[in-house]
Amino acid sequence: MSNSNIDNDPAKIDSLLKKAKSKKIPVTYDDINKALPLNKNPSIRQLEEAILKFSDAGVDILESNEDDEIKLDIGMDEEFKLSTNVDNESEDEVEEENIGSTDDPVRLYLKDMGGVDLLTRENEVEIAKRIEEGRKTMTASLCRSPIAMRCFIVWYEDLVNEKMLLRDLIDLEANMLHDEVHENDEEHNSETEVEEHEDNHLSMSRVETQILHNIIDRMKKISFICEELLIEAKKCYEESFEPKVLQNSKKYNNNLELLINEVSEIHFNSKRTEEILGKMYGINRDLINKETAFLKLAEKYGVTRQNFLDEYIGSVINAAWKEKMLKNKKVAWKELITKESDYIDQMINELSVIESNTGLLVNDFKKLVNTIQKSERQTLQAKKDMIEANLRLVISIAKKYANRGLQFLDLIQEGNIGLMKAVDKFEYRRGYKFSTYATWWIRQAITRAIADQARTIRIPVHMIETINKILRTSRQMLNELGYEPTATEIANRLSMPLDKVRKVMKIAKEPISLENPVGDDSDGGQLGDFIEDKNAVAPIDAAIQSNLREVTTRVLATLTPREERVLRMRFGIGMNTDHTLEEVGQQFKVTRERIRQIESKALRKLQHPIRSKKLNSFRNGGKRGDGNPSDLLEA
């Protein structure tokens, strides 16, 4: 069957969509591919727009399944069958088509992305609550750890003593941009965003100055609470060593609640959180290694794994536990404790050191780490769900920034980074949809990347901002004046030094590749072919010099060998340099005067019309204009 009527039929996608919606059945990626032009591979833009069209309409897009034979009765061509069996094609052709469809990374990305359902407003709120719950649990758990308390105290001291920058402690971007995201038209001019984006970036330092004192005051309060908690915890463990005593302490619980509330109000830098988690996870790994080694040792003495866990888990491993296990009814335990007494004593000491470093009993510390890890997994999974459901939004925004200096995949990657930031900072209680909030962050990430990476010669972002400001002013003045403004006029309008304006306008010029084609024809050549090489010898000059050498050689050959040799040495003809009368005299073992006489005689011979007329054309050509025949020989 001919495909000529299908290739250019713009209604095929709409017809497929209409039938799928009316019959409430899904489509596959093969169906979409078949509905696109078949005379050539569909472009990324066509495929992406088709997938977004079906997704926005609520039609499910399924993976291709060779066992399914679901068909749509649309009364048109067989091309709309959802069956993956392709008629009238050889197996080799089918295999080549499948390979081609999975080779393109963009197509693979779009295919995987299309398999994730879009979120409703309720779904977004539900996921946001999961993220919030995970964060609350993690914050509360971290605040219960003396390790975190000590970190808070150190951070405050470093901040006050100017050993740490504020941006290294908190997420400045979240504090600065939190109130700047408003509902705006998605068709906002993307070029204007690129120009205005840097103003926000440059204000980061101003925001740091503005909120520094507020953060210092808050960290001072956190540091004071942590010191109170550490003192009370130390006192409790020294006196009773019973966790329940501390848990029942009203003062301790009140201070702990205050600490959790204060820490929750600060958006700490992710590196700071990772610093605390890294310390706790490192100690936990050390504990697991020690327990694993102890378990293997116990199994050698016949202690079963389950019995070991029953006796070990939940117990405080100390001298009292050792005495208790000596009285155990199981012979294996008695043998283990008796023969490995030194090993167990060493382990008890090591666990005691860990308890001292963590400020918690080993069992309490392990429970705390498990709670943190569980909340971290919960938060990461919720973020993953939110990100995957909004990948289409990134593509729809990235399309608007095509041909701006970055490839489409790079735009998607940068947009995805912005999407992840949006997920981290989204607050569902403000009432706006996540897509509205995320759009700003995605655009911000893409425009930042374009400003930072698009140019062949990288220019700092602050200079990009100045360039955009001058270009924007230049366009405004062009509309007002009717002609291109001069650098002086722009400098006066912006109250900027003239030298700086000229420098910026010079920097603003985009470099051009020497391999750019010239003309519409394939034989037009490249731009580099038309650039003058000032060091290269012109072809006509090279031809003249070559001819001059040949004529000079023939003319000198009419002299005696001695005269020819003297002239060549004196004027450097065919040699690297010329020679003095004394140097030539030493060569011929005669005096300087004799060489001068030979030279004069040879030059008089060259002035004879028979010889000189052969050289006159070179002299008249203006290469050597003083008329001296000897000058003509210097070539």
UniProtKB/Swiss-Prot annotation:
It is found in: Cytoplasm. GO terms for biological process: DNA-templated transcription initiation. One of its GO terms (cellular component) is cytoplasm. It comes from the Bacteria. A motif (Interaction with polymerase core subunit RpoC) lies at residues 410-413. Residues 555-608 are annotated as: Sigma-70 factor domain-4. This is RNA polymerase sigma factor RpoD. It comes from Rickettsia prowazekii (strain Madrid E).
